[in-house]
């Protein structure tokens, strides 16, 4: 593959937005991922790499039916996904994968007002 021939081909958000206490982070990952795949006309069988932070990328791949050759779980805060893009480009250019899904799923608004974990009140 020639350098510079990597492209972002699909992008999407989850179908529902806002306060979503009835949907898990994994479900939000999956919903956004399926919407992104639909945006570019591919399915889980076309993806051979996955990258995400916070949630386990292997669990997300399994949930979506993806069998990855490449997995990136780099988590460094809010810029994790920009690092995933750079890692994905390097993985594709080196032949480690052909199509890499970068996903995120979280509804921080759903946790507003909730008691933090480990706090007894």
Go through the PLM ranges and name each one.
Residues 1-76, 89-94, 101-121:
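Conserved "HGTGT" condensation-loop signature of ketosynthase/thiolase-family condensing enzymes
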């Amino acid at each position: 593959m020639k350098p510079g021939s990597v492209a972002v081909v699909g992008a999407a958000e989850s179908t529902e937005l806002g306060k979503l206490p009835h949907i898990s982070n994994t479900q939000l990952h999956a919903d956004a991922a399926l919407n992104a795949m639909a945006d570019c006309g591919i399915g889980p069988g076309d993806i051979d790499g996955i990258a995400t932070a916070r949630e386990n990328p292997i669990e997300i791949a399994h949930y979506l039916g993806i069998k990855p050759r490449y997995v990136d779980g780099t988590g460094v805060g809010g810029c994790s996904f920009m690092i995933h893009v750079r890692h994905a480009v390097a993985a594709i250019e080196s032949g480690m994968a052909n199509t890499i899904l970068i996903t995120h799923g979280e509804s921080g608004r759903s946790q507003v007002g909730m008691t933090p974990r480990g706090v007894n009140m």
